[in-house]
């Protein structure tokens, strides 16, 4: 699911806030004492959730990816990050750093692994089989591999992508197919799911935080999470694609947005590339859209955005 995982992680974070495990305006360093220096001690969890923590790009030495699941190592590396601006000054999508930060904050605050929390509090009570951060080693061969297709991206977009994600498409995609990544716990990108289960998770959100008798979030919590905190404007980390944000959730819009046109009430998250999970309460719509092709400059890539628009056109506003 790549970054569409962030919709699921955002749900977990707001659930934990609602339960009093931590507050959005708590400082990150109150949970991760190594997250200081270069002004980072002023960073709050809200700054991280809203992509305004000032660390959209991984700075410093390249991390050892073989140690992705090593919390001590992750906290050490996060402590070395140098913000490019003070916390809260601006919003730039944190594609790489968001997941490790959230994982370690949740672990430090609760004493539990975020994968376990997601499973025991949401997925297991609702009978999900395939969804979580990574899969068991025995299930790796069942995961559909991703493929780079089409022409290379235009140079400016390719450069922005490489800066935001730490590599080119031809580097990222093979790594994401590896057993090492597919069994990792990276709340920003390593979630594996199916279209059915993804849309069912979106249905939790569409129904205001409850599904089949399992209450995940109160309606007022979800309303606060989807309240606009960043108006629609281009983001340099997404190739200047216009983005509108709540607290962790991407928000839809009328003309431009991640969920097609005329989707002002929609919220969720997209993933690299042509993957999306969103809920649109105004249409009674919950969507999980998955694909394995990463089309770059392929002439057929426009079919994805056309599909989003078609969904909204076919499902009338309620």
Where in the sequence are the language-model features?
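Short, gly/Ser/Thr-rich active-site loops of penicillin-recognizing serine hydrolases
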Residues: 207-210, 226-234, 296-318
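Short, well-ordered beta-strand elements
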Residues: 277-278, 284-293
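Short, structured beta-strand/loop micro-motifs enriched in basic residues and often containing a Trp
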Residues: 268
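Short, small/polar residue-rich loop motifs at catalytic or cofactor-binding pockets
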Residues: 271-273
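Short active-site loop at a secondary-structure junction
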Residues: 1-48, 86-96, 186
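Residue-level recognition of short loop/turn positions
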Residues: 19, 282-283
């Amino acid at each position: 699911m790549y970054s569409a995982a962030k919709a699921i992680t955002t749900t977990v974070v707001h659930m934990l806030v609602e339960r009093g495990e931590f507050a959005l305006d708590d400082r990150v360093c109150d949970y991760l004492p190594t997250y200081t220096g270069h002004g980072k001690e002023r960073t709050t969890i809200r700054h991280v959730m809203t992509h305004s923590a000032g660390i959209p790009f991984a700075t410093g030495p390249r991390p050892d990816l073989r140690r992705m699941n090593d919390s001590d190592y992750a906290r050490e590396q996060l402590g070395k990050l140098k913000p490019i601006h003070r916390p809260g000054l601006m919003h730039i999508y944190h594609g790489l750093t968001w997941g490790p930060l959230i994982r370690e904050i949740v672990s430090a605050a609760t004493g539990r692994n975020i994968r376990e929390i997601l499973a025991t509090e949401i997925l297991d009570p609702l009978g999900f089989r395939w969804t979580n951060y990574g899969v068991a080693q025995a299930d790796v061969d069942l995961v559909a591999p991703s493929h780079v297709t089409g022409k290379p991206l235009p140079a400016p977009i390719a450069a922005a992508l490489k800066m935001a994600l730490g590599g080119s498409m031809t580097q990222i995609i093979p790594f994401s197919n590896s057993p090492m990544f597919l069994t990792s716990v990276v709340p920003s990108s390593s979630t594996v799911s199916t279209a059915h289960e993804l849309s069912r998770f979106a249905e939790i959100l569409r129904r205001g935080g409850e599904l089949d008798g399992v209450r995940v979030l109160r309606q007022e919590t979800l309303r606060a999470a989807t309240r606009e905190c960043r108006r629609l404007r281009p983001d340099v980390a997404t190739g200047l694609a216009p983005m509108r944000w709540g607290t962790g959730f991407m928000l839809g819009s009328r003309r431009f947005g991640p969920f097609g046109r005329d989707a002002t009430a929609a919220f969720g998250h997209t993933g690299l590339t042509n993957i999306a999970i969103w809920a649109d309460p105004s249409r009674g719509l919950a969507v999980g859209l998955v694909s394995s092709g990463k089309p770059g400059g392929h002439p057929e890539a426009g079919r994805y955005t056309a599909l989003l628009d078609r969904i909204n056109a076919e499902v009338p506003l309620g």
